[in-house]
A protein has these predicted regions:
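Loop-to-transmembrane helix boundary motifs in multi-pass membrane proteins
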Residues: 8-18, 101, 133-140, 232-236, ...
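Membrane-interface loop-to-helix entry segments
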Residues: 3, 134-186, 219, 242-247, ...
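Helix-loop-helix junctions that connect adjacent transmembrane segments
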Residues: 3, 8-9, 42-45, 123-134, ...
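Membrane-interface "cap" regions at the ends of multi-pass membrane proteins
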Residues: 1-63, 69-73, 194-195, 417, ...
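Hydrophobic alpha-helical segments and their helix-loop junctions in multi-pass secondary transporters
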Residues: 113-118, 150, 167-198, 257-266, ...
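TM-loop-TM module centered on a large, flexible mid-protein loop between adjacent transmembrane helices
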Residues: 78-79, 85, 117-122, 243-308, ...
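Hydrophobic transmembrane alpha-helices that form the core helical bundles
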Residues: 38, 56-68, 72-143, 148-151, ...
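Terminal cytosolic tails of multi-pass membrane transporters
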Residues: 1-13, 387-415, 434-492
Length: 492
């Protein structure tokens, strides 16, 4: 946006409240609430801890980087590449894309459960939600429908995403919290063990593995950094919007988690079904059983909108970078709508293969958890690269204008970067430990999938980078050279 275009530019400035709401809608999702409801009151500690050491540092650091390179495409590829070279920059954008690809089956599993609960018989719905074949077919059907819609272009994506976010996330979140509050005030039995207290037992590592998944709850906040220059007085108003949005996000997560804990005993919580079961229990208590299928449809629509947004997002990012010579011509093909057709098809193939893990995992729940952990691991690697790059660029590009700067000196950047990097590293290590609360099958399968998955997904972009050829570069590519490159010659 041209901010120098007189009143026209000012008309498009975002208010603090608007940006805060955008932050909330970009991050909030309900599907992960059951994983934290297991922890009872201590879940609030995990949400707050992750917000302090991850959510806020991510939003603030990404804001400086986004403003610094607002006139250049590439996102994390640009940020990391300027600090550590094109090879590592390609690794960062690759991880952002591949983790979202691996994430699809997990969020779609939740979508399949929502579809199962459209019926009126709770027992039959639960049995259907646990059926591997039903879940597999539903996951693939929803994903390929989302891909087909994405192929039609951004106009379709925008319409469905806009309404899906409101109908499938914001309204159900508010309803869940209201139901929980009214339930307790009306004398309903509280199944949450309040004696556990706010602080968890941090000496038991296997008890905090699920808590590391909270970092994935907050993932994606770096994408909001592109709006840093869309507010008046960004040095004052952007941090204010981030703080307000972060506090509201934490409040929604905490209250939503407590609402589930109030109505479902911890021992009965299921990662994939408990959100729907919680709604059903509340509706029965208030004699509103007819509303169960309605909320299931709404959540299902929200899943479709969420997947559609991500199908069209990270794949577009790696497509743009690929045209600059980092991907073979096959991956640069588009359809008549200008959509990255071949990347979407390859992405769909990966999702289909991953979904077949249903047949080797002991349950839908274990499949959901292990893929969630792999997604977290890959995304955290990207975040560690981003935090490290932000600090390094304070020295490599110290004279480059920063429209939004964290502090006058380097102290605040060091603090936020170190806190974010340290928090990401801690969550990365914890994510390898099998959770004690969930049956994930053989530990050998758990470690094999996570370790081999991480190694393979990190090595692949290095292989692609080593094999690149001059003929891969599209003359129409709009990726500016890095500051350390001479002219437009890429690093060899």
């Amino acid at each position: 946006m041209d901010t120098n275009n007189g009143n026209a530019g000012k008309a498009f400035k975002l208010s603090v409240a608007t940006l805060a709401i955008m932050n909330i809608t970009a991050v909030v999702s309900l599907r992960g609430l059951p994983a934290e409801a297991i922890y009872g009151p201590s879940s609030a500690f995990y949400y707050l801890f992750a917000a302090i050491v991850f959510l806020i540092p991510t939003a603030m650091v990404a804001a400086e980087l986004a403003a610094m390179f607002s006139d250049k495409q590439g996102g994390v590829f640009r940020w990391v590449g300027e600090a550590f070279g094109a090879r590592t920059g390609f690794l960062a954008i690759w991880l952002q894309w591949i983790e979202s690809t691996i994430w699809y089956p997990t969020v779609l599993t939740f979508g399949a459960v929502s579809l199962a609960y459209i019926g009126m018989d709770g027992a039959s719905d639960a049995a259907l939600a646990s059926n591997k074949v039903f879940t597999l077919i539903t996951v693939l059907a929803i994903y390929w429908i989302a891909t087909f819609i994405a192929m039609k272009g951004l106009s379709w994506v925008g319409k469905i995403s806009k309404w899906g976010g409101m109908i499938g996330t914001i309204i159900p979140a508010g309803l869940l919290i209201i139901l929980g509050i009214v339930y307790i005030l009306s004398g309903g039995h509280n199944y949450m063990d309040m004696s556990q207290g706010f602080f968890p037992d941090l000496t038991k590592l296997d008890n905090i593995v699920l808590a590391s998944s909270i970092f994935l709850f907050y993932a994606g906040m770096e994408m909001m950094g592109v709006h840093v220059m869309d507010v008046n007085n960004p040095s004052r108003n952007y941090p204010k919007a981030i703080i307000i949005g972060s506090l509201a996000t934490v409040a929604i997560f905490v209250l939503g988690t407590f609402a589930l804990g109030f109505i479902i005993p911890a021992k009965d919580i299921n990662l994939t079904q408990s959100l729907l079961i919680g709604f059903d229990n509340y509706f029965r208590y208030f004699h509103l059983s007819w509303a169960g299928p309605v909320i299931a449809v709404a959540l299902m629509f929200g899943v479709l909108a969420s997947v559609l947004t991500w199908v069209a997002g990270p794949s577009k990012g790696i497509f743009t970078v690929g045209k600059a010579g980092y991907l073979p011509p096959f991956f640069q093909k588009t359809n008549s709508h200008g959509v990255q057709r071949n990347i979407l098809l390859v992405q769909g193939g990966i999702v289909t293969l991953l979904s077949l893990l249903f047949v080797v995992m002991p349950s839908v729940q274990s499949f959901y958890q292990i893929l969630s952990q792999l997604t977290i691991l890959l995304y955290l690697i990207m975040y560690m690269l981003m935090f490290a790059a932000a600090i390094v660029l304070r020295y490599k590009m110290k004279d480059t204008p920063r429209p939004f700067r964290l502090g006058k000196g380097n102290g605040l950047m060091w603090f936020l970067g170190a806190v974010g990097f340290g928090g990401s590293l801690l969550a990365f290590v914890l994510s390898f430990i099998p959770p004690g609360q969930i049956q994930t099958g053989s530990n050998a399968v758990w470690y094999s999938v996570l370790i081999i998955g991480c190694v393979v997904m990190v090595v692949i972009p290095y292989i692609i980078y080593a094999m690149r050829k001059p003929s891969w570069k599209d003359p129409s590519a709009d990726i500016a050279p890095f500051h350390w490159e001479k002219g437009t010659e890429q690093q060899k």
